[in-house]
Amino acid sequence: MIQFQKKTPNFLFYDYETFGIHTALDKPAQFACIRTDINLNIIDDPQYFYCFPSDDYLPDPGSVLITHITPQYTEKNGTNEYNFSQKIYDILMQSNTCVVGYNNINFDDEITRNIFYRNFFDPYEWSWKNGNSRWDILNLLRACYALRPTGINWPKNELGLTSFKLSDLTKTNNIVHLNAHNAVSDVYATIEIAKLVKKKQPRLFDFFFKIRKKNELYKLIDLRNFQPIIYISAYFGAIYHNMSCILPIAWHENNSNILIAIDLFKDIKTLINMCKKICFDSIFIKNLLDSGVVLLHLNRCPILAPIQVIRKEDYNRLNFHRFSLNKKIELIKKNMFFIQNIKIIFSKNNNTNQFFNVDLEIYNGFFNSKDKKKIQIIRNTDPVFLKHIFCNFHDSRLKNLFFRYRARNFFIH
C-alpha cells in the first residue's frame, strides 16, 4: 500500500447507503470510501462502517429491501450518528482531497452536509478548506455522452433512452460490479467508470476536472459580450442529451453563487413577452423557470463548457443550430428590459422556507462566530456533562438542534 501524503493531491471516492431517499430527514446506514492518487490508482485500503438510526426515526422498508442493511444489523455493527459523523469528518478533512462519487452532488454530499449539521460539525468546510474540492462522476458521464461519446458503451433503459444507472453502465462496459447498492462495491465501480472515461476521453476528463471549482467556472462567463456556453445537466433530460446552450445574463442579487441564464433551446419570444410585466407570484416564477430561465449554482460543480466544444460533426446528433441560437441572442440584446425585469423578479424571490422542523433548516443561513464557539464547546464536551451546558444561542435553530443531538446520540446521559 502506498503511504498517503497529505500534500499529495488525491481523490476520495465515497458512497452512502441510507434508510431512505430524503437527504435531510432520512438517516445513513453505511459509509464507504477509497482514496486514490490523481491518476486513479488506489493508494489506501477501503474504509467502511455503519450507523444505527436513532429511536425517533422509522426506516423506509423499501430502502432496506434494496440495500439489505437492516436497523438490527447496524445496531450490532455500527455507531450512533455523532461517532459516525466524526469518523467521516476526519476522513474528508485531509488536505488536498477531491471528494467524488456517483450522483454525490445531489445526494451523498447532501447527506454529508446534513449529518454534520445535526451533529455540530461544519457542514461545508470539508469541500473547500485546505485545498479540498468536490466533483461528480455522474455529471462527467453525462458530459462525455453529450460531447465525446466515442469509446464507451451507452446502455438503454426500457424507454429506449440512455441509462446512467451505475449498474447499467458497469454491465454494458464489462466492469465488475458484484453487489450493487453495497457502498464498498459501488465505490469500486465508480473508480472503474472514472478510469474508463479517463482512458477513452482523457482530454474531456482533464478539462472538466480542471474547471470543477467555481473560481475556474467564473472564467467561462462573459456577461458583457453575451457569450453563450454549454451546460450539461439532467434538468434538460436524456432526450436532449442532458444538454443545452445557455446565455448568462446576470448574477443573482441576493446570492453571488447563482448565475441567471436563458436556455437558448427554448422559445425566447414567448419568454420575453412573459417578462413585459413584473410579477413576484410563485406560480409565475415557476412558469419562467419552465419556459427557459435557468438558475445555475456555481458552488454545486455544474458542468459548463465553451460553445466551441460542439464540433460541426456533432450538430446533427445534438440537433444543434448555431444560426438559430445567434438569432435568439440578438433578440435578447434588442430587448434589454427583459434582462432588467428578470433581475428584479428574482431579486425579490426569497426562497428561504419555514419548515418548522430544524432538521430541514440547514440552508436557512450560516451560524455566526459566537454561535460557532458554542458549537465547538458542545462538540468537545463529554456526553456525561452535556446536560450542564446552557447556551444562549443567537440562532434559534441551535436550541432545537442541541436537544435532538443529546436525545438521539446520548439518551442515557
From Swiss-Prot:
Residues 350-413 form the ExoI C-terminal domain. Substrate binds at E17. It comes from Buchnera aphidicola subsp. Acyrthosiphon pisum (strain APS). Monomer. Interacts with ssb (via C-terminus); this interaction stimulates the exonuclease activity by recruiting the enzyme to its substrate. This is Exodeoxyribonuclease I. Its EC number is 3.1.11.1. The N-terminal exonuclease domain and the exonuclease C-terminal domain form a central positively charged groove which binds the DNA. Residues 202-349 form the ExoI SH3-like domain. InterPro entries: EXOI_C, EXOI_SH3, EXOI_SH3_sf, Exonuc_1_C, Exonuclease_RNaseT/DNA_pol3, Oligoribonuclease, RNaseH-like_sf, RNaseH_sf. Transmembrane segments: none annotated. Its cofactor is Mg(2+). SMART domains: EXOIII. The gene is sbcB. Residues 12-193 form the Exonuclease domain. The record marks R148 as: Important for interaction with ssb. The record marks R113, Y124, W128, R142, K214, N257, N299, Y363, F366 as: Interaction with single-stranded DNA. Mg(2+) 2 binds at E17, D186. Pfam families: Exonuc_X-T_C, RNase_T. Degrades single-stranded DNA (ssDNA) in a highly processive manner. Also functions as a DNA deoxyribophosphodiesterase that releases deoxyribose-phosphate moieties following the cleavage of DNA at an apurinic/apyrimidinic (AP) site by either an AP endonuclease or AP lyase.
